Amino acid sequence: MGRIIVVDGTSNAGKTTLCENIEKNIQDIGIVPGASIFAKINRSRYPKIPAIPQSAEEEKENQKFFFRLELDRLNEANRFANQGKTVFMDRGVLEILSVAYSFESINGWDGIYKNAQDLYEQFISYARNMGINLPDKYIWLQANYEEIQRRNKLRQQERGQLLSETDWIEENLIGKQIEFFRKMCIPENTDKICLIDTNNMTKQEVLEEVCSLLKLQLKVYDRGEK
């Protein structure tokens, strides 16, 4: 049985980039793409992805959708792990709690974080009862607001996105995300959570740090192959 590792953290901290580099540079790896890409791949089950909520009630409905989606993603991770692969998930179920924690404070939507916590407990209970393995490890990537702004502009230019696409990089949201993940980094979780500050790290350095933490070997390429 392979390990299941979730890559999570603040917006634009390098989660998807890390997963792409892992897939390219490490053997016997399974990658579970982020929720929106996973939903597009499985369009028959998820024909429409909810928009950013405009009210507490919309957020609670969104939570139900994304918890169902996360269960499918976790099942996909288990499928890879049962093949003996080391599995990396581009974000995981705690992302839902992170969003609820942030939106409750920023928008004043009382009760949405508690609602997410209740759904999370149901999610964990269901997974255990069904024999679905939960993640073995969490890699949390963190970057400050200034660095996130810089990376977002660069990524938008590299990937052809509009420069106005900034819904997930507002300073107060990033601050709340950092606060949430720090709250999770309690002593009881130290064997499960690895927090990496990516502010002054290159993509390659982040990849090498993850390989060191997880005792994974990078592929050895022949000259000119990479």
Predicted regions and their residues:
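Hydrophobic anchor at the beta1->P-loop junction of P-loop NTPases
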Residues: V7
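P-loop (Walker A) phosphate-binding loop of NTP-binding proteins
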Residues: T10
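ATP-binding Walker
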Residues: A13
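Walker A/P-loop
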Residues: T16
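Conserved substrate/cofactor phosphate-moiety recognition/catalytic segment
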Residues: E23-N75
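ATP-dependent NMP and nucleoside kinases share a basic, alpha-helical "lid"
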Residues: L74-N82, T86-R159
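NTP-dependent small-molecule kinase module
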Residues: Q149-K226
